[in-house]
């Protein structure tokens, strides 16, 4: 596709991480993929190949689990050579003082209502993390150019940091007709899908994005989806994965 023709967007949530497997709030903590997560990255690359969906450029966060998933997927799809742009604005939502804590234990201590407010409400952030504490990123060198490193975020904060980056940077590649792969995180991708599909602040609470399954959006010249909600390359696995995400916090 050339010129101002429709771009193709592929969203990919990183494969299962070590803290996903342990049911811990992760946020900006930089954890590794599990063996399952590595396999999910490989399967994502196989799906890209099967659907002849070959990215021209990759955008990722600054976090290892997204970077590793993208590297595995692109290597599998023989697209390891494409240009890569990494940016903190694609990072997972910062979970504040909840980072490193077990979701089931937080739910048990604070109750279902407070747990769901922190986890899924649009504008209620968890308590801020203490600067300098074990799971804070305020001294992390990768964020040295930020005026202020977040100590907590709600989904609204992710929207505020991400959508200008989408409009100012990523959109140019799509408007040029490129196939753009964004490999990121549950909440940064939820923020972008909210924007693309015009999902309300209330309804976004019900959107769950599974790990490791590419989600395709075909966009018109105004970057509006021609296929609202996107199209998962493996719909059955995506439905099962989204249900598993929704159930996090259970014992």
Curated annotation (Swiss-Prot):
Hey, what's the signal peptide range on this chain? none
Q: Which GO terms describe its biological process?
A: gluconeogenesis; glycolytic process
Q: In which pathway does it act?
A: Carbohydrate degradation; glycolysis; pyruvate from D-glyceraldehyde 3-phosphate: step 3/5
Q: Which residues cross the membrane?
A: none
**Purpose:** Catalyzes the interconversion of 2-phosphoglycerate and 3-phosphoglycerate.
The record's section on CDD domains has: HP_PGM_like
Give the matching InterPro entries. Answer: His_Pase_superF_clade-1 (IPR013078), His_PPase_superfam (IPR029033), PG/BPGM_mutase_AS (IPR001345), Phosphogly_mut1 (IPR005952)
Q: Where, in this chain's numbering, is substrate bound? A: 13-20, 26-27, 65, 92-95, 103, 119-120, 186-187
Give the enzyme class: isomerase
Q: Which domain of life is it from?
A: Bacteria
Query: Which protein is depicted?
Result: 2,3-bisphosphoglycerate-dependent phosphoglycerate mutase
The record's active-site residues are 14 (tele-phosphohistidine intermediate), 92 (proton donor/acceptor)
Q: Where is this site: Transition state stabilizer?
A: 185
